[in-house]
Amino acid sequence: MWKLKIAEGNKNDPYLYSTNNFVGRQTWEFDPDYVASPGELEEVEQVRRQFWDNRYQVKPSGDLLWRMQFLREKNFRQTIPQVKVGDDEAVTYEAATTTLRRAVHFFSALQASDGHWPAENSGPLFFLPPLVMCVYITGHLDTVFPAEHRKEILRYIYCHQNEDGGWGLHIEGHSTMFCTTLSYICMRILGEGPDGGVNNACARGRKWILDHGSVTAIPSWGKTWLSILGVYEWIGSNPMPPEFWILPSFLPMHPAKMWCYCRMVYMPMSYLYGKRFVGPITPLILQLREELYGQPYNEINWRKTRRVCAKEDIYYPHPLIQDLLWDSLYVLTEPLLTRWPFNKLREKALQTTMKHIHYEDENSRYITIGCVEKVLCMLVCWVEDPNGDYFRKHLARIPDYIWVAEDGMKMQSFGSQEWDTGFSIQALLDSDLTHEIGPTLMKGHDFIKKSQVKDNPSGDFKSMYRHISKGSWTFSDQDHGWQVSDCTAEGLKCCLIFSTMPEEIVGKKIKPERLYDSVNVLLSLQRKNGGLSAWEPAGAQEWLELLNPTEFFADIVIEHEYVECTSSAIQALVLFKKLYPGHRKKEIDNFITNAVRYLEDTQMPDGSWYGNWGVCFTYGSWFALGGLAAAGKTYYNCAAVRKAVEFLLKSQMDDGGWGESYLSCPKKVYVPLEGNRSNLVHTGWALMGLIHSEQAERDPTPLHRAAKLLINSQMEDGDFPQQEISGVFMKNCMLHYAAYRNIYPLWALAEYRRRVPLPSLGT
């Protein structure tokens, strides 16, 4: 039986360590000795069958396995009767209150013992296969993924195969060469034959690959991983010279000027490229060489495949200047750097690159910055020393990335513990039900306090291209270590709100000095245009995006400013200024003024804002309206608010909700869901955005219609149904935030009940 473990380390593993006793850590274990009742087993099998039967209709999982576990362990039973509001009935205060209480009690029961809310954070289908390939190469496949793990990984692959036989970049996407190839190889490594798998998964996948040009058309990241595995040749890849890491810092393309994720992906990739590392050529690798190409492997002209990419994978076509750069490196530079005496320079570059990798590993407790980087850095450590401590420390942190749901085992981006908990706490606080959920709030407060990053990265962190992190919050847990501006702002907001509440209910307030550290992080990340970046100060030259080496992402080379980060920071600093009016007053005032200007300047012509981390214009507009409202901007004194209200009202569906397709993100224009369906998460965002604009004072009818949809959509136990995917990154790849379906309908109903006048049955 699969069990989710919370905040657990391993006293018997000397390679596993933590900065705060593993608070926020979430790991899955299969317990073969657990004696499950027939009812438990049937419940698990039932939700698996239901997902499989509906896999083409609702592609994100409901994240049900741990929910069933927690509700069973806490003996939760929904005792508050469900309410429905008829078409010709008005929403009453009692109906809103009852629905809200049901949602609050259900969601509180899902809180973990350390105070956070666990949730799946995955969706891209290129996360897990490289991990399987890595442990296969290093000889650790059986220990990392024993039989029950393999079974669940295969379940996940089968569940998310498209009807045409391929796999998308993410679970809702059209089939791509990249993820179809990775999924096929993963199935073969895990023991499926060339024609094996449920519903002929392997044969259908291989047919899709060969019908679309064979693996020679895989994009650059795929070429890299296949070269590492031994089913492609390095000579067919664009150069990734490690010499970038010893360039003079004044050059515009120096790694210090790169976006941290780009830097952290190409750091280990460049090491592996510089070494031309290839894993052991096993019988399976030789079979894959035969299966994945439309011609004999030894007859392929690898030089001609370097620029080939399947049209299904191309989101960002490479400009001519980039092709010229890679050609120059390929033809002129690489032949020199592999020969004496220039190979001495390469050796120095590899040593410098390795130094940076070890630094990043140590400062993240071997979690690294994310799952793509994790696997690459782990492999590099094995290449350096297969029996070394660095690699063993990486192995110890693999469980931090693994997640199990009714659709199988997947790899998380790295966990959204702090992000989800910050919003969960604010939603619960807005419910005005403190007297009913005091212990929940106290535990959540404790988690947030314990998760704050207490120190900057070690040593001379600026020479390692790192920014300050002391006082920040990460996306996941403290061990991760990477500061994020909006996570910091949301954590700061929670601590500020808790500081105004009785300590006997919510626990001791955080020390002011730690709040000052958070403010310092936020102030350090604002650019001259008023916008706030996410991880590190933005400021590199925009033309560097022309050198984006990926084909399926956009805006990945340098750090940018984001509407959501800017808005979160405005809201946090406005509240901080109210409670601590004497601290850096002038700087905070200037920050807010410039940030508001940024929001106004980045509004789209239709009145919306592009959301960088959620779908899409609905998400961005909710954030922007929240920031503008906090800064004192209203419908009557701000044209941007009026335009945003017009956009939201115009996009409201006939049933009272909002529903936006994920296609809005890559297309950068508003696209409604197919069939004009509503999505409850999107409805929550839009409803809160309109409430921020004080729509209730002008015409509350749109708010009542949206609230009625939320009330009538609540399930029997107080949950809300899982619908379409809601998160995104880098314009073109979707991310499943499983907690969103609880947080945002609940939060929207809380705001609605608190701020919109409602009739009462007693009057």
From Swiss-Prot:
Classification via CDD domains: SQCY_1
Residues the record marks as active site: 486
Reaction catalyzed: (S)-2,3-epoxysqualene = beta-amyrin
MF (Gene Ontology): beta-amyrin synthase activity
InterPro entries: SQ_cyclase_C, SQ_cyclase_N, Squalene_cyclase, Terpene_synthase_CS, Terpenoid_cyclase/PrenylTrfase
Entry's Gene Ontology BP terms: response to ethylene; response to hydrogen peroxide; response to jasmonic acid; response to metal ion; response to molecule of fungal origin; response to nitric oxide; triterpenoid biosynthetic process
PFTB repeats: 100-142, 150-191, 441-485, 515-560, 592-632, 641-682, 703-744
Main location: endoplasmic reticulum
EC id: 5.4.99.39
Tissues with expression: Mostly expressed in roots, and, to a lower extent, in stems and leaves.
Pathway: Secondary metabolite biosynthesis; terpenoid biosynthesis
Superkingdom as given in the UniProt entry: Eukaryota
Inducing stimuli: Induced methyl jasmonate (MeJA) in adventitious roots. Accumulates upon Cle-mediated signaling, an elicitor derived from fungal cell walls of C.lagenarium, thus inducing the accumulation of saponins. Triggered by ethylene (ACC), rose bengal (RB), nitric oxide (NO) and hydrogen peroxide (H(2)O(2)). Accumulates under heavy metal stress in the presence of NiCl(2) and CdCl(2). Influenced in roots and leaves by relative humidity, and in roots by soil water potential.
GO cellular component assignments: endoplasmic reticulum membrane; lipid droplet
Residues annotated as site: Transition state stabilizer: 419, 475, 613
Record membrane topology: Peripheral membrane protein
Subcellular compartments: Endoplasmic reticulum membrane
UniProt keywords, alphabetically: Endoplasmic reticulum, Isomerase, Isoprene biosynthesis, Membrane, Repeat
Cross-referenced SUPFAM superfamilies: Terpenoid cyclases/Protein prenyltransferases
Subunit note: Monomer.
NCBIfam families from the UniProt entry: squalene_cyclas
Function: Component of the oleanane-type triterpene saponins biosynthetic pathway. Oxidosqualene cyclase converting oxidosqualene into beta-amyrin, generating five rings and eight asymmetric centers in a single transformation.
Entry's family note: Belongs to the terpene cyclase/mutase family.
Name of this protein: Beta-amyrin synthase 1
Organism expressing this protein natively: Panax ginseng
Source species taxonomy: Eukaryota, Viridiplantae, Streptophyta, Embryophyta, Tracheophyta
Gene that this sequence comes from: OSCPNY1
